[in-house]
Regions:
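Beta-rich accessory regions
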Residues: 26-51, 56-67, 90-108, 129, ...
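Boundary at the C-terminal end of the N-terminal hydrophobic targeting segment
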Residues: 18-23
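Bacterial N-terminal signal peptides that target proteins for export
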Residues: 1-8
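Beta-propeller domains
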Residues: 64, 144, 160, 165-195
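Beta-propeller blade signature
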Residues: 182-186, 241-248, 295-300, 354-365, ...
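Bacterial N-terminal signal peptides
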Residues: 8-16
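Hydrophobic core segments of beta-strands in well-ordered, beta-rich domains
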Residues: 50, 100-102, 152-172, 194-198, ...
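Surface loop/turn signatures of beta-propeller and other carbohydrate-active proteins
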Residues: 29-33, 69-88, 117-154, 173-176, ...
Length: 612
């Protein structure tokens, strides 16, 4: 994935091109003042390529079409050096006069100084834009944007064999801004095809998170099987908007009656679904600063009635509440079902920054009633005990009754500083939600890798049915191909030991250590020496997850990609997702124990191949 080149000219070559801004280049630049310039497009070319300095200050580009303002872009135009280019697609404006009124940051003393900014000699027209990968940390089998910033997944639905993944995207830089709905599709949840931008900012503001449903009965009035999107329009205030698609989510029409819902305080990330027992649509809306979820109902996806609110004083109240989801799951061993409400918060996660908490309970179509513990309290439960799984939401209309989710694999504490340039952030692996009972009688949510991922496995390079380990580490080579990318599976019986350690490392003495503490019944993940860690004080960390199974033996599945490790214990009952940035690929797995011998069973190391 992400090796697809849809267009041809290398971006790096453009950085060296230093094309003169003249009539011959098809671009004319007029410097009107120390922080104001005009870019006039006079030639032909599909893209206007803008040079970006990733750490630079933001410039405002007002796009004028035949002299009238069409939209505004925020771009970190290069002042000192060009890190990369981003494309403005001029195709929709063909036949019109296109001008950009550019407001650059203050700090230039004269027009002469302003004209020396690196951007002005590197702006160019081109018929092509290259998205081939230039990043050593781009994952092999995780979804990433071809270029630009990405955060929350949103609007996900399944239709006619295709998984649609939309996401918060900045197509004009690798830091947060210009939020649109990027779009990718897959038939196997592994290999993702980049699609054109789906929904872009308009006069109501940026396009924040939301959800999509397939309106099979045509209740919204846009025809049967239309895809309906609800999203937050974010400007000075946050309002809710609707768009619809009649081509299976490739392009969307903006509803002229937007906004369809307004509130006096921050409310965002509408998540909707059809509630069959009451024959109505249900929407959850995050009342962000009030730490609650608002529950609305509608007959037609346009007119919404507030029915109840949930969350006041419950769960973690430390940060804003965002990105809700609500779905029903069967309770194993019974004929009952329970509802699960996902609530993403930032900050307030168990190890700092952003994280996903959840509640189990009952839902009658209007009100969510949470389960309580033996003391009558509503416990705080976490979906993932790593640092890097946020904004987890599910696909609507997933096949075979599945509840399949995906998250943003980063953390708001340091996402903008991660050591990549062409793109920032990946998604987690897709996961299947399930319920299980803990020793305390409470219901908990499991999160296991989606079954499609098994297709990536090649013949294992290591396969050991049983071995004993002690203080002296036993070391195994990771697959030589694909930078050591692999899936590791094993069962750990601590036997007489107190701790069992798994260390994944490289020749630069960088490593991640996973430790199973048999007495505490916990598993921890130490990435303090994992590679590049100094880009943020919040990145070096040890995360710890409780184990929920009663026995002493723990089963692990560990997915190692170029910049992440995802650990699933006991079929996803305990999960940790953490990003890593080793200076060279990991090459070895070492196993050891302290306090006595431990037993390892069913160790396998699988090379992973996404495309088959």
């Amino acid at each position: 994935m992400n090796k697809l080149t849809i267009l041809a000219a290398p971006m790096l070559a453009l950085s060296a091109l230093a094309a003169s801004a003249s009539a011959d280049s098809g671009v004319v630049i007029d410097h009107l003042g120390v922080n104001n310039s005009l870019i006039r497009v006079t030639g032909d070319g599909r893209y206007l390529l803008l040079p970006v300095e990733d750490s630079g200050d933001e410039s405002r580009l007002n796009l004028l079409l035949d002299g009238k303002q069409e939209r505004t872009l925020t771009v970190r135009l290069a002042k000192n050096k060009v890190d990369y280019h981003v494309p403005v697609d001029l195709t929709p404006y063909k036949g019109h006069t296109v001008t950009f009124n550019v407001i650059t940051p203050q700090g230039r003393s004269s027009i002469r100084e302003a004209k020396e900014d690196a951007c002005w000699t590197s702006i160019a027209l081109s018929d092509t834009f290259d998205i081939s990968n230039r990043e050593k940390y781009r994952p092999l089998f995780h979804h990433t944007p071809s270029y630009g910033w990405m955060n929350d997944p949103n609007g996900m639905f399944y239709k006619d064999g295709v998984w649609h993944l939309y996401y918060q995207h900045n197509p004009y830089g690798s830091k947060w801004q210009n939020l649109s709905w990027g779009h990718s599709t897959s038939t196997d949840l592994i290999n993702w095809k980049p699609e054109p931008e789906a929904i872009e900012p308009n006069g109501l503001g940026l396009v924040f998170s939301g959800s999509c449903v397939v309106d099979s009965a045509g209740t919204a009035g846009f025809g049967k099987n239309a895809v309906i999107a609800l999203y937050t329009s974010a400007d000075v205030s946050q309002t809710q908007s609707l768009a619809w698609s009649t081509d299976d989510g490739t392009t969307f029409n903006i509803y002229p009656g937007n906004p369809i819902l307004t509130m006096e305080s921050e409310a965002r990330d509408p998540n909707m679904f059809w509630h069959a027992p009451t024959q109505q649509w249900v929407m959850l809306l995050a009342h962000a600063l009030d730490h609650e979820m608002l529950i609305f109902t509608s007959p037609d996806l346009k007119d919404w009635t507030l029915q109840s609110n949930f969350g006041k004083g419950l769960g973690c109240q430390d940060g804003v509440w965002e990105c809700p989801d609500l779905f029903e799951l069967p309770v194993p061993g019974t004929d009952k079902k329970k509802w699960v409400l996902l609530c993403n918060i930032n900050p307030g996660g168990p190890f700092g920054g952003s994280a996903t908490q959840y509640f189990t309970g009952d839902f009658d179509g209007k009100t969510f009633t949470p389960d309580t513990d033996a003391e009558g309290k509503v416990p705080t439960k976490w979906l993932d005990y790593g640092k890097d799984n946020y904004a987890t939401v599910s696909w609507s209309d997933a096949p075979d009754g599945r509840r399949t989710v995906i998250g943003w694999m980063s953390n708001w504490q340091y996402a903008a500083e991660a050591p990549t340039l062409q793109y920032r952030s990946a998604n987690t692996l897709p996961r299947e939600m399930g319920l299980f009972s803990g020793a305390d009688g409470q219901l908990y949510l499991s999160s296991a890798p989606s079954p499609e991922l098994l297709a990536m496995r090649a013949k294992p390079v290591t396969s050991a049915s049983h071995m004993s380990i002690g203080n002296k580490p036993r070391t195994f080579a990771l697959p030589a191909a694909n930078d050591g990318i692999c899936e590791i599976t094993l069962d750990i019986d601590p036997a007489k030991s107190s701790e069992v350690a798994l260390t994944i490392g490289n020749k630069a003495n960088e490593s991640v250590t996973v430790t199973y503490d048999a007495a505490a019944r916990t598993i921890s993940f130490d990435r303090r020496n994992s590679g590049l860690t100094d880009f943020s004080k919040d990145f070096p960390a040890v995360t710890t997850a409780p184990l929920f199974t009663a026995g002493r033996t723990v089963s692990l599945r560990i997915y190692v990609d170029r910049s992440s490790i995802e650990l699933f214990a006991d079929d996803g009952r305990s999960v940790m997702t953490n990003t890593i940035f080793p200076t060279s690929p990991y090459t070895t797995l070492s196993l050891s124990s302290t306090g006595g011998k431990a037993e390892i069973r069913n160790l396998k190391i699988y090379p992973l191949t996404p495309s088959k």
